[in-house]
Structure formats: C-alpha cells, structure tokens
Swiss-Prot record:
The keyword Cytoplasm applies. PROSITE patterns: DAPB (PS01298). Pfam families: DapB_C (PF05173), DapB_N (PF01113). NADP(+) binds at R35. Signal peptide: none annotated. It is found in: Cytoplasm. CDD domains: DHDPR_N. (S)-2,3,4,5-tetrahydrodipicolinate binds at H156, G165, T166. This is 4-hydroxy-tetrahydrodipicolinate reductase. It comes from Vibrio campbellii (strain ATCC BAA-1116).
Length: 269
C-alpha cells in the first residue's frame, strides 16, 4: 500500500486526487496540505471530497506529516511545488508533479532533484492524452514535412497559464519527432499583419471559457485534406486516476526523472 500526500488537497484538482487515491486499492491518503491562510486547515480530507471521515486532517505544512507518507502528488503552482520538491529531497520521498507553468530555470531545479529522488512529471496524466502524444509523434514523421501544424486548446475560465502544459507537450512531441526544438518553431500568438506562415512553424491558439475541463486538437493541414487528432476531457477524475496510478508505479523506482510514457510503457509500442 502506497501512502500518498496530496498538496493543495482542498482545491478542485486536490479533492479529485484525494478521492482517486482513496478509491485505488493500492493507495491510501495519509496526508493533505493547504495554504496556511486557508480556513479549511484542520478539516478531514475525506470529508472534503465527500468520501466520509479518513481521520487525516488538512495541514498547512507537509513537513509536519513527513513520517506519514511515501509519495507527494502536487498539482498546485510552481512556487509551492518547488518547496514540496525540496521537502522530498531532504526526506527521501517520491513526488508526482502535475503543476505546469515552470520557467526553464525551475525545470532545471526539477531535473537536479531527480538525481536524488524519484520524480514523475507530465503535462497531463490522462492515459488518453499520453496515447495522443505517441500518435502525434507518428503523424509528424509521416506528414510533418509537408503539412501546416497548428494546436488549439480550450480550458475553463480559471486556468492561469497559457498555452496549457498539455498543448506544449503536444508541440514538443511533434517538434521532437521532426528533429526540432519547440522553442525554435513555436508561434504562440498572431495579431495584425503577420506575413505568410513559415513552413516549419507550429502555431498555438488558446481558448479560456466557462467550465471546459480540457480540449486539445493538433491539426496537420495540407492542400485538399486535413488530419486532426483530438482529446476531450469531461471529468478531472481522469487526470487524478492517472496521477495516482503514477504514484503507485513510482513508489518502487529508484531516483530518476520519469514521465507518463514510462508509467504506461508507451515506449514499447
């Protein structure tokens, strides 16, 4: 049984992670944290997600619970995720990172930490999305040289970063399959007189509206035909279930940087 701590357990995603951990027969929720100013500190985490009492109470600092968990699942914000990563380094704990919006310097800190503790980091923990990443690699190898490639993503009005980590992950999968770095070919905004589209660019368009959980489409457009690969999420539990699956998988692994491709064995396809 893997003992799991949920960072940001009172948030929308946090509550789903608590529930997913509780429902997974190989996992147990043994700690949960929230910001010190939250009025929910001290509340039973089971009651937060509607699953009854767990006798596990929301803390304002996971350091207080460090003996009670094996793996942290963190879908919060870069600053708090890096603080929890440091905690894991100091105490030999594993961490699942679902937070997006890291700078290049922050990504380097994560890479360094992975030399000391096991880390899974992914822009999306849905099994379907990670299969899409693999399909995009194959499509890019077949069609990338002669098609225009565009990525469109849509999320709820509360999402604070753009484009989404998943959209960037799609772009990285496509660019990598074509032997490019995404930073060299990405175009994140178009406005005014932009001139004609260049051959190699990968364009991104972002929508923020309503309660959209997450929709992503990669378009390979040629003259006379267009291939679109789309994933639509309708429930955050799909991400939560994938993250808990990753936590169970990671618990037995040595220090290193892993992705959902490793968790799901997609490199074997």
């Amino acid at each position: 049984m893997v003992r799991i701590a949920i960072a940001g357990a009172a948030g929308r995603m946090g509550r789903n992670l608590v529930k997913a951990s509780h429902l997974n027969p190989e996992a147990s929720v043994t700690a949960g944290s929230e910001r010190p100013e939250s009025s929910l500190v001290g509340v039973d985490v089971g009651e937060l997600c509607g699953e009854g009492k767990f006798d596990v109470f929301l803390t304002d600092d996971l350091t207080k619970e460090v003996d009670n968990f094996d793996v942290v699942i963190d879908f919060t914000a870069p600053v708090s995720t890096l603080a929890n990563l440091e905690l894991c380094k100091q105490h030999g704990k594993s961490i699942i990172i679902g937070t997006t919006g890291f700078s290049e310097e922050e990504r380097e800190l994560i890479d360094e930490a992975a030399k000391q503790v096991p880390v899974v980091m992914a822009p999306n923990y849905s099994v379907g999305v990670n299969l899409v990443f693999k399909l995009l690699e194959k499509a890019a190898k077949v069609m990338g040289d002669y098609c225009d490639i565009e990525i469109v993503e849509a999320h709820h009005r509360h999402k604070v970063d753009a484009p989404s980590g998943t959209a960037i992950g799609m772009g990285e999968a496509i660019a990598g399959a074509m032997g490019n770095k995404l930073s060299d070919v990405a175009v994140y905004a178009r406005e005014g007189i932009t001139g004609e589209r260049t051959k190699d660019e990968i364009g991104f368009a972002t929508i923020r509206a309503g309660d959209i959980v997450g929709e992503h489409t990669a378009m390979f457009a040629d003259i006379g035909e267009r291939v679109e690969i789309t994933h639509k999420a309708t429930d955050r539990m799909t991400f939560a279930n994938g993250a808990v699956k990753a936590a169970v998988w990671l618990h037995s692994k040595p220090a290193g940087f892993y992705t959902m491709t490793d968790v799901l064995g997609l490199n074997e396809l």
